[in-house]
Amino acid sequence: MITILGAGGGIGSELAKLLIDRKQPFRLVSRSPGAVPGATETVSADITDQGQTIRAVAGSRIVHLLVGLKYDHRLWAEMWPRVMANAIEACKRAQARLVFFDNVYMYGKVNGPMVEETPFSPCSKKGEIRASIANAS
């Protein structure tokens, strides 16, 4: 089973379409998931709650973490560490691979191409938060 945490956003919607086209079974997880023709399952869960996250991920082999939070660095500082910890713990228990779609805030201003080895050099609070999460994971 492929699970999409944060299925209500633009990236989750596009991934769901791709999985439908490929006839892959998948589970959509969000606080209030809508019916999606072709989705194997829909699950309502608050992934800031560890128990709900563990239940939502149970039985998965791949979990896509595509959650979006309100664009506020104070909220990010409070919620992202919890969301990430819950997703990692749930994937460990399910023995699932975690795919995290991240942004580039942690890199700051980069001259030239960005590659996997590009060092973190955040230039904002949001960037510092994302770098700390990436370094802790």
Regions found by a protein language model. Give the residues of each.
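Hydrophobic alpha-helical segments typical of transmembrane helices
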Residues: L15, S30, I133-A136
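Short, well-ordered alpha-helices that flank and scaffold nucleotide-derived cofactor binding pockets
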Residues: K17-D21, E89, N135
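Short, contiguous strand/loop micro-motifs
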Residues: I2-T3, H73-L75, F120-S124
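NAD(P)H-binding glycine-rich loop region in Rossmannoid oxidoreductase-like domains
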Residues: G34-A94, Y107
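N-terminal Rossmann NAD(P)H-binding glycine-rich loop of SDR-like oxidoreductase domains
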Residues: I2-Q24
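Conserved glycine-rich Rossmann-like NAD(P)H-binding loop of the short-chain dehydrogenase/reductase
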Residues: Q24-R31
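Conserved Rossmann-fold NAD(P)-dependent oxidoreductase catalytic core, especially the SDR/UDP-sugar
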Residues: P25, A85-S132
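SDR active-site strand-loop-helix element
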Residues: L5, V29, L66-V67, F100-N103
